[in-house]
Structures are given as C-alpha cells and as structure tokens.
Amino acid sequence: MTQISERFLVQAHLDAKQPKALSPEEQAHYRAAIAAELKKQDAVMVAHYYCDPVIQALAEETGGCVADSLEMARFSNNHPASTVLVAGVRFMGETAKILNPEKRVFMPTLEATCSLDVGCPVDEFSAFCDQHPERTVVVYANTSAAVKARADWVVTSGCALEIVESLMDNGEKIIWAPDKHLGRYIQRETGADMLLWDGACIVHEEFKSKQLEDMKALYPEAAILVHPESPEAVIELADVVGSTSQMIAAAQRLPNKMFIVATDRGIFYKMQQLCPDKIFIEAPTAGNGAACRSCAHCPWMAMNTLERTLQCLREGGNEIFVEPALIPNAVRPLQRMLDFTQAARLRQAGNA
C-alpha cells in the first residue's frame, strides 16, 4: 500500500508558508474584498474546522459555514448559491462538486490534499476490493472521487460507527479504507468483520500516549478529547472519542473547565468561540522541530490563505472538476450517507 514520502510532506509545509504575516489592516482589506467578491458572484464559502482561524471567521461573517466534512457537504448541497468556495482540502471540494454538479466549485488552492487520500490510490484500492468481492466497501470521506466511486458507502468520523453497526446487523462483512486507526476503533467498538487499508493521517498519528499521560498528570482536572484517527494507545486515554463536531459538543456539555485536545489545533477557534470560559490545550505530538511532521496542524489546511482565496475568486482559477463518468457512482455512496444521517437525526428529534 502507498506510503507518503517525507519529501512530499516537507513540500506541503513549504507551500503552506505565508511570504509574510499579514497586518491587521491587510487582513481587514482581504476580508472585505473577499466578502464583496462572494456577493458579486452569488457564492457561499464553507470552511473546515482545521483551517486557520481567520478563514473560519471569514466563512461565518459572509453567511457561509464552518463545519466538519459531513456538514460541509450537507450545507453545500442545501444552499441556493450557484457557486461554492470550499476552504479545506481537495476531497472536500470534490465532494461538493459530486453532490452539486450543476454548481461551480472553487478552492483557494488545488494543491491542498490529504495524506489519507494520497495513501489510497484508486488502482491499488480497486485491486484490493476485487480480491474480496463478497465484502461491502466502506470508505472514509477523506478519499478521492475515484475511490468513492468504487465504494458502496462513504462515511465521516461523525457517522462511521452507526453506519458500520447497521451494516454489521445486516450480516455484511466490510472492507474499510483508508484510515487504519479509525478502522480499528470502529472494529473494536462494533465487533464488525473488517479488512483494513493501511493509511493514516499525518496529524493524528503524531499524538503520543506517554506524553499525553504526562500532560494529564500535570492537569488532572482536564478532560481528554481524542479524534478516532489517533493511535489506539491515545484513544484509550480519552474521556471522549469523537469527530470534530462531537468533540466541540463534548467541550460544551462537560462540566470540566480544562480540556486536552488530540486533533488539529484549528478546532480551537470554534471551541473557544463556543466556550469562552474554558481552557483548551493541545495534546502533545512527537515534538516541534525536525521530529515533527505536522505539529498538530495539517500543512495542507494551512494552504487556505486570504491571498489565495481572493485570487481564486477574482481570477476564476482553482475550479474543481470531477470526471462526469465518475459522478453517478460517486454520488450514490455519498447520498446513502446523507440519507442515513438525516434519518438518524429525525429519529433522534422524535425521541427528544
């Protein structure tokens, strides 16, 4: 299975670097100009929780949304705007286009990818699936349009447990891709029969259980929130394991005043916005410097800058295109996910 080269990761960090930090006045100029372009072009901006805070704030103040990948997809699908600007990584832009082929979809950069996507090339994955034709193919949203088109179901970390549990109840055996840590977590929680692809997120794989234990000893009153893309030893230390939205909800719900958070630090913008009286601490990674591959912030998410956002709107560049032949097969597993989660919401509302 495909391994991510260190050279590729280094290049991602270099590409994410700003030539210079923007002053508050420059930031205000870019934000006003982007807001005007969005209005002029009948466009709405959706941003992921892992983008830099200034990008998340811009999406909110222009009538867009900041969300996890599931809600980004749902919002893009339901919003009446004719153009969608996706601040995130490439698979998110592709997902918006698959669900809205009639809309124009742009991204600040097309170079913003994902180690999970890159580590699951469609030719290798299709060959793997062909070896096990009796199994239901479930892929994480962090995959290319071509891989989604090979799948029976697409899931996010927010709905993966429930969907796999439902498939297991139907007696189905599963191929899971690409995140092995999330796959193992689901396997442990559900007992499902799953064959796992060997992929990992460069951010979450860096969290270390020993250092997390040491940090917990320093802050015994803190609750530990962990994303399920993290290694098993880190997950075992968690008070709450969940998707980005589930972690944010836990921060609001739990009485703790302090939280140690094992996910991309971009999420702190929304956590601090919703819980201004609480303290959030980054869970420890391999450490800063040469030993640190992500330092708890995705280098590709960091490529979504104000300059690139304005440039893409003004020049009409970085438009997302998905091969038309892929769309019918790719939309099917995505729509299954949206239908399943919508039905679950209605059931939950009925039981409230």
Swiss-Prot record:
Binds 1 [4Fe-4S] cluster per subunit. Its EC number is 2.5.1.72. [4Fe-4S] cluster binds at C114, C201, C298. InterPro entries: NadA, NadA_sf, Quinolinate_synth_A_type1. Its cofactor is [4Fe-4S] cluster. Transmembrane segments: none annotated. Pathway: Cofactor biosynthesis; NAD(+) biosynthesis; quinolinate from iminoaspartate: step 1/1. It holds the Pfam family NadA. It catalyses: iminosuccinate + dihydroxyacetone phosphate = quinolinate + phosphate + 2 H2O + H(+). Belongs to the quinolinate synthase family. Type 1 subfamily. Catalyzes the condensation of iminoaspartate with dihydroxyacetone phosphate to form quinolinate. HAMAP family: NadA_type1 (MF_00567). This is Quinolinate synthase. It comes from Pseudomonas syringae pv. tomato (strain ATCC BAA-871 / DC3000). The lineage of its organism: Bacteria, Pseudomonadati, Pseudomonadota, Gammaproteobacteria, Pseudomonadales.
